[in-house]
Structures are given as C-alpha cells and as structure tokens.
Amino acid sequence: MKVAIDIRRVTEFGVGTYTRNVVRALSRLDHTNQYFLIGSPQKATEIGPLPPSFQTIALLDDGTTARGYIEFRAILKRLQCDLVHIPHLFWMPRTLPCPYVMTVHDLLEHMYRTRTRSSLRRSLHLHLTRRVLKGAGRILAVSKFTKSEIENVFGIPGSRIEVVYNAIDERFLHGHATDADRQVLAERYLIKYPFLLYAGSISPPKNLVRIIEAFSALKAELEKEGKFPDLKLIIIGDELSKHPDLRRTVIRSGVQNDVRFLGFIPIEMLRVFYDAAKIFVFPSLYEGFGLPPLEAMAHGTPVVTSTTSSLPEVVGNAAVLVNPENVFEIMRALLHLLLDQPVRDQMKKRCYEQAKKFSWDVSARRILEVYAEVAAAPRTPARLQAGETTRRVET
C-alpha cells in the first residue's frame, strides 16, 4: 500500500503527540508499505529518524485554506495513494482521490467551543462534520467514550468506528528521576518544596479554577493539621495570558504565594515534575482520552481525576475519582492522599499496572489492519453519497 499521513499538526499538543507516536510505531512494525508524510519537513524532524519507506512530502499550509486543500488533494493524486490517514477531526467535506481514515480525539468543538456561535453556525458545523464522518473509510476513536459520543451526536453506526487507544510517549518510560534531575528542578526552577501538579492545556474544560479553589481549601485544612505548611500548586500549560480569570482566582483564594504557573515545559523535564509531585490533580470536565493522568501514573504518582467522560475508562481503579464540579470533594481527595501513606503506597502499585495496559505498538498494529481493510474495500454507493461522489472519474 501507499499510505499518506497528514502531519501538518505534528507539533501541536494532543494531536501532535498522537501523530508522532503513531508514525514512530508504524516505522518499527511495518517494513512492507510505503508512507508519505504530508506537511512541513522541518516539523517532521519532531518525529525523529525514520526508515527509507517513510518520505516527507512538503506542504507548508496549515490545513485551513482552500489553496492548502487543493495542494493536499493534488499530492495524493500524484502519488497514487491507496489511502490517507488524517489524525484529527475536521469539518469541511473533502473530495479526495483515495479513501481517508480519520482519528477523532474528542468532540470538544461541538460540546464547548460552539457556545459562542450562532445557532445557524452551530447547525452548519454539525451538518458538515457529520458529512465528513460519513465519508470516512473508517473512524478511529481514542476511547470507548469518544466512540459513543460520535454515535450519539452524529448518528454514525458503531460498526464504522474502531476504538484504538492512545498510549504514553516513550520518553515518559525512562524510569524515575535521578538525583541529578531533581537538582535541575531545584536550581533551574527553584523547586525545593512539596507540590501538587497539573499539566495540560489551559482552557475552561480543564477546570483549573476549581483546582485552585480546592487547593486553597486544602491549605486551610492542612494548617489545622499542622502538615505540609510549604505545599505549593504547580500549573504547567501554555496560553495562560488568554485566561486572566486564573490569576484573579489565585488572588481571590488567597494563595498567590503558593501557586506557580510555569508555562511550557519540555518532555525531558516534564517527566521529572511528574516524578517529584506528591499528587497529580486532573479533575477535567471533558476528555476524549486524557493522557496526562496516565503519564503521571507511569511514574507512580497518585492521581485525582474525574468521574466524567473517558477518564474512568483510562485510569481504571488506579486513581481517586471525584465529581469535578464539587470543589470540596476534590479537596477531600487531595487531603486523603496526602495524609494516608498506606493508600498512597497502594495507589502507586496500581498506577504502574494501569500505565502498562496501553501501548503504541498494540495500537499501531490495529491501525495497520484498518488501513488494509479500508484500502481493500469497494467504493459502495452509500459511501459515494456520503461525500465521495467526485471520486468516480478519478478512481
């Protein structure tokens, strides 16, 4: 097969992590098929060294312009690709010269971000996204939760959706932080105190306002107990400047001396933060998969996360689950994990076991099977009506 993969978002958080690790796993497992990585050659270096069967095809457009769409389509036609994998959800229908496999990470665009749009724009967005999903040769959902969302919101039959789980970036599997790593933490970031950790994107669904409020309540409880007087909350994530409400929450909660915003941290150091944290706190309101809790678990760090969306599916019995809308429930979970050492020891063991259940190689093997099934499938009338009508002449 000739397989194209759209890598134009390979440097982004989430989609980029997925794209890099899928390509790496495919390069380890597949020595038969030919792959064309369509996107920026400079960004492709983020993936690392690849065998000769993986070739980067330059396309600098970010995927949002008509010109970029035309160039993308022309590349697929010129290379005579058997299929293309687009590793993210998109909404503008595309008449491509070969079948496409699409990965859906979540439906956040339809659950939260559409609230600021008019009802007409929301309806159009929903309608066009449904057409795109119906036109896909196969849809890859990163969790059972995301699969059920696609079925319920768009009416796509479950038989056309394959659950293929995410996994941890291999750089988080290099063992515990060394004394030298912790020295860097102390010298470069001036961290010489116990801390709770949040790592991820900075956006309303991540529930950071309640994390800060729960931390403030926790400090008050710890003061009564005479425990952890120097405990801090560290928040790692970009785009803080777009969310001034977080700074206001810190000041209103009276913890301005105990909350630190560190912005972007490279993976090589992020693993040290995971390893050194007392607890990883992630009471997100909505996750299609939710990798950060799993990354923390790989280091044996206890996790407090949500009872909602995909998170119970991902963390299993290896985390403390809370109602993400209840600040005091979050606080009580944090307090319990901080003060009960036997529970911490039990959670650490479960964390290691849970993290091992997810593997990029296992996921890539299933993706390869899907590629073969889609490439071999006949173009049915139903598929043509769903968005492939213009392919009849080209195929």
Show where each model-derived region lies.
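Carbohydrate transferase catalytic cores enriched for Leloir-type hexosyltransferases
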Residues: 1-395
